[in-house]
């Protein structure tokens, strides 16, 4: 056999001394005698025979026969490389796909299937957080989950990275129990037989990065990306205490992102064993361990002194001490600056009739056809959780709504006693400052103003509200949104974005509406405003504005937009100039309406009209002055003749 092998591989220098080793191995007592391979030599000679696998094949290696005497002897002769692809059952390596046009990497938010589970075609395998949203990753064929290679919460997984292994038969799952990505890597030839696992395991070296090695089974909960632009967050409030039981869908903490304060929910049942980041801690980087969750209540005490290095330096930030007043008065404590241990509620109760519900509970309620107004929430501030939906028994009489808690905000602080107060800068306020500064410094703004006769719109609005009485209420701002969207279709240059290398002209009009909240300015989006009726727009605006003020907006509801409207007319502001919201090219500033004398074809020669002043801020890189004027002309035409919005 060796002569056949050596003859075919005679041009391979690394194998020159193998004949002597082959003979020596066969002399070892107890080693089975292996004769030359029977049968004719292979007819095909076009395969590569200069590599490890090629020489093994020429020497009679038979992968299908498993651990035969011949195979064991060849492994000792050639040096085993460890487990290789062809030594495993048939399987499929599942790579991370591109789930958005601009996606370069993703985060495994949650695995929907566990190792050993059967996967049917169309089943959701995992939820992957892209640069745009969290997207479900579905299976394209029937199979079984053999091995998960990328753990939940792993961030910045590049596209194409292998995230799991699937097999066609359930009996093949066991073969991948210890499979790792390194298992299929090209091995380094070994000069001796593979040692036993006990011999290869080196003693663990002390490392502060592995504090959980001597702890009971547990899960580190990392700070996730709760908005596409989030790089860090502030732990506003912990809704659970150490030792409390956690159920799927329970609100764990309130996290302040760069856009809003968002509830962070529990994905699975367990017990809160340790809080690693205290309330009020600011600028916590993404991926930082926030807390420890265990499956068994008895394991909680083991984590009393748990201290991972990632969070040892994270402490609640206290505002700089306020200098004492100049006047000679007895020094008094400064109660105005909120301490991290007792922050203001991140999410004040909403107006009468508002239902607080977790996303998971809301989804289950829709599936079961449950009216959320009839469900009594047992979560924080009356929040409805998954447990409430599961235990809900429908009744004919809906329970009385919970008492409305008066909203509290940053302004409702104790009476000042010094000459000034230092207010900590929130993440939202910091981002607003950065973006507005960037806009004014990098975008060449110019401004165009025009007066619009609102008489016809006011008449149409009055008639429509009579028709919709008890169903919806349309505002003047809803007509403005509709007219703006239609004007953007007429003058698409105003519905464009500066993208550094190109000007992107958008084919749909998503109108961002500026809303003032206690936390700062935010711009929820009325999507596809150009094809929606004013009633639908009115309902969208009311819903979005309410969610914005309560900090309940989801990232996709305020990220994006192609055109922005800012309305200060309700405050009596006659006119103002707004700052462009990049990468958009325009923003429309709406002033108050006031009665003015205008020329008219009547006996008096004049009439009294309700005139509204608007100012369009334009990016001169995208919209030239004449183009901006054309847009305002179209906008005024739609409002002064609202019937044309039906064309």
Swiss-Prot record:
GO BP, sorted A to Z: glucose metabolic process; pyruvate catabolic process; pyruvate decarboxylation to acetyl-CoA; tricarboxylic acid cycle
Domain of life: Eukaryota
Molecular-function annotations in GO: dihydrolipoyllysine-residue acetyltransferase activity; identical protein binding
Enzyme superclass (EC): transferase
Localization per Swiss-Prot or TrEMBL: Mitochondrion matrix
EC number of this enzyme: 2.3.1.12
Changes after translation: Delipoylated at Lys-132 and Lys-259 by SIRT4, delipoylation decreases the PHD complex activity.
Keyword Repeat: yes
Residue stretches of biased makeup (Pro residues): 317-346
Pfam families, per database record: 2-oxoacid_dh (PF00198), Biotin_lipoyl (PF00364), E3_binding (PF02817)
Known role: As part of the pyruvate dehydrogenase complex, catalyzes the transfers of an acetyl group to a lipoic acid moiety. The pyruvate dehydrogenase complex, catalyzes the overall conversion of pyruvate to acetyl-CoA and CO(2), and thereby links cytoplasmic glycolysis and the mitochondrial tricarboxylic acid (TCA) cycle.
Associated clinical condition: Primary biliary cirrhosis is a chronic, progressive cholestatic liver disease characterized by the presence of antimitochondrial autoantibodies in patients' serum. It manifests with inflammatory obliteration of intra-hepatic bile duct, leading to liver cell damage and cirrhosis. Patients with primary biliary cirrhosis show autoantibodies against the E2 component of pyruvate dehydrogenase complex.
Protein name from the UniProt record: Dihydrolipoyllysine-residue acetyltransferase component of pyruvate dehydrogenase complex, mitochondrial
């Amino acid at each position: 056999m060796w002569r056949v092998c050596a003859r075919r591989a005679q041009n391979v220098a690394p194998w020159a001394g193998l004949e002597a080793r082959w003979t020596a191995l066969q002399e070892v007592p107890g080693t089975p005698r292996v004769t030359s391979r029977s049968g004719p030599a292979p007819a095909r000679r076009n395969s590569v025979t200069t590599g490890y696998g090629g020489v093994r094949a020429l020497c009679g290696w038979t992968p299908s026969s498993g651990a035969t005497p011949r195979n064991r002897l060849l492994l000792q002769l050639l040096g085993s490389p460890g487990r290789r692809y062809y030594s495993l059952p048939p399987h499929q390596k599942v790579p991370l796909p591109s789930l958005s046009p601009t996606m370069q990497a993703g985060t495994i938010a949650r695995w929907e299937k566990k190792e050993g589970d059967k996967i049917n075609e169309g089943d959701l395998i995992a939820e992957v957080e892209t640069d745009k949203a969290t997207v479900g990753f579905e299976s394209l064929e029937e199979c079984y989950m053999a091995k998960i290679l990328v753990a939940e919460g792993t961030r910045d997984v590049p596209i194409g990275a292998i995230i799991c292994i699937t097999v066609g038969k359930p009996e093949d799952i066991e073969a991948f129990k210890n499979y790792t990505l390194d298992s299929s890597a090209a091995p380094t030839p070994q000069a001796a037989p593979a040692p036993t696992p006990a011999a290869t395991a080196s003693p663990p070296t002390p490392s502060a990065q592995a504090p959980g090695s001597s702890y009971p089974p547990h899960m580190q909960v990392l700070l996730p990306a709760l908005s596409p632009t989030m790089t860090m967050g502030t732990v506003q409030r912990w809704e659970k205490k150490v030792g409390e039981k956690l159920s799927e869908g329970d609100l764990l903490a309130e996290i302040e992102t760069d856009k809003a304060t968002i509830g962070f929910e529990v994905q699975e049942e367990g017990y809160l064993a340790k809080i690693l980041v205290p309330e009020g801690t600011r600028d916590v980087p993404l991926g930082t361990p926030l807390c420890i969750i265990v499956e068994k209540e008895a394991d909680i005490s083991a984590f009393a002194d748990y201290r991972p290095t990632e969070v040892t330096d994270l402490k609640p930030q206290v505002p700089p001490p306020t200098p004492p007043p100049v006047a000679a008065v007895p020094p008094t404590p400064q109660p105005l600056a909120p301490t991290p241990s007792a922050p203001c509620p991140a999410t004040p109760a909403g107006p009468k009739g508002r239902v607080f519900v977790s996303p998971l509970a809301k989804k289950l309620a829709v599936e079961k056809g449950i009216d959320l107004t009839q469900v009594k929430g047992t979560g924080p501030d009356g929040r409805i959780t998954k447990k409430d939906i599961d235990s809900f028994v429908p009744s004919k009489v809906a329970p009385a709504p919970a008492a409305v808690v008066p909203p509290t905000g940053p302004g409702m602080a104790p009476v000042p006693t010094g000459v000034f107060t230092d207010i900590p800068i929130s993440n939202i306020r910091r981002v607003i400052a950065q973006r507005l500064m960037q806009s004014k410094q990098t975008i060449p703004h110019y401004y165009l103003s025009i007066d619009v006769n609102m008489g016809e719109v006011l008449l149409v609005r009055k008639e429509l509200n009579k028709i919709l009485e008890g169903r919806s209420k349309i505002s003047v701002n809803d007509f403005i949104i509709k007219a703006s969207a239609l004007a953007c279709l007429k003058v698409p240059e105003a519905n464009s974005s500066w993208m550094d290398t190109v000007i992107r002209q958008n084919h749909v009009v998503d109108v961002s509406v500026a809303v003032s909240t206690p936390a700062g300015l935010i711009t929820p989006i009325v999507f596809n405003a150009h094809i929606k009726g004013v009633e639908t727009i009115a309902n969208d605006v009311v819903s979005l504005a309410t969610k914005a003020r309560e900090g309940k907006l989801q990232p996709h509801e305020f990220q994006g937009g192609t055109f922005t409207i800012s309305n200060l007319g309700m405050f009596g502001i006659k006119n103002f100039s707004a700052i462009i919201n990049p990468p958009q090219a325009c923003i429309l500033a709406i002033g108050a309406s006031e009665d003015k004398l205008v020329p008219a074809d009547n006996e008096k020669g004049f009439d009294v009209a309700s005139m509204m002043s608007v100012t369009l801020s334009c990016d001169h890189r995208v919209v030239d002055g004449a183009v901006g004027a054309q847009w305002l002309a179209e906008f005024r035409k739609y409002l002064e003749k609202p019937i044309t919005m039906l064309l």
